[in-house]
């Protein structure tokens, strides 16, 4: 038995470096696909974004830092929440397959005319980044984000993507998911959120550590009203049921 293992090891060592690298990459690729398949059925106990927040706190010697994260099935979340998230972050979510090329084209056009480069990430891309990857901007992370997004869209129904997004999105410093945010900031459960509550939560998503749900400034109040109007124009929660 040992000789057989040793013989295979010797064969592997004689392979050229590029072949060994290819095998390693294939194994990593298969493992990443397996991750996606597992979370199609298993609710994630943590996301990589949460892990990163812990590391950030510990690097600042905040040893008592604790996340606020409470998983909540989509059936236990008020219908006003998913449509508010879609209205705020990705209005073509039911229509695309993970990448909104129209939004990407508009963002690049806006940037070419001298404007700042606006984000065009879909909800699916945000789930891929928040669940599996690290924060920050780099071509490597963006490439991996695209890889995970492809498999997420292939294996998960849209309903599952929204469910995980609603549970791992950050709504305040260390506050993840609509249930934790609703309890902490609005003293409600996610099932009891009305349209105004849901829009207020969704309004802080671009910069959850910058804006305060409990004490919203003029921008958040304006954005919350805008999200409510957009959700209504999309057709409310029926917009998600139709696709």
UniProtKB/Swiss-Prot annotation:
What SUPFAM superfamilies does the record point to?
Answer: Lysozyme-like
Where does it sit, as one GO cellular component term? plasma membrane
Task: Spell out the reaction equation it catalyses.
Answer: [GlcNAc-(1->4)-Mur2Ac(oyl-L-Ala-gamma-D-Glu-L-Lys-D-Ala-D-Ala)](n)-di-trans,octa-cis-undecaprenyl diphosphate + beta-D-GlcNAc-(1->4)-Mur2Ac(oyl-L-Ala-gamma-D-Glu-L-Lys-D-Ala-D-Ala)-di-trans,octa-cis-undecaprenyl diphosphate = [GlcNAc-(1->4)-Mur2Ac(oyl-L-Ala-gamma-D-Glu-L-Lys-D-Ala-D-Ala)](n+1)-di-trans,octa-cis-undecaprenyl diphosphate + di-trans,octa-cis-undecaprenyl diphosphate + H(+)
Q: Where in the cell is it found?
A: Cell inner membrane
Q: Name one GO molecular function term.
A: peptidoglycan glycosyltransferase activity
Sorted alphabetically, the Gene Ontology BP terms of this entry are: cell wall organization; intracellular signal transduction; lipid metabolic process; peptidoglycan biosynthetic process; regulation of cell shape
Chain ranges passing through the membrane: 22-42
Pathway it belongs to? Cell wall biogenesis; peptidoglycan biosynthesis
Q: Does the keyword Cell membrane apply?
A: yes
* Source species, domain of life: Bacteria
Membrane topology category: Single-pass membrane protein
Per the UniProt record, one Pfam family is Transgly
**Keywords, in A-Z order:** Cell inner membrane, Cell membrane, Cell shape, Cell wall biogenesis/degradation, Glycosyltransferase, Membrane, Peptidoglycan synthesis, Transferase, Transmembrane, Transmembrane helix
Function summary: Peptidoglycan polymerase that catalyzes glycan chain elongation from lipid-linked precursors.
- Family the UniProt entry places it in: Belongs to the glycosyltransferase 51 family.
Q: Which protein is depicted?
A: Biosynthetic peptidoglycan transglycosylase
Write down the species: Xylella fastidiosa (strain 9a5c)
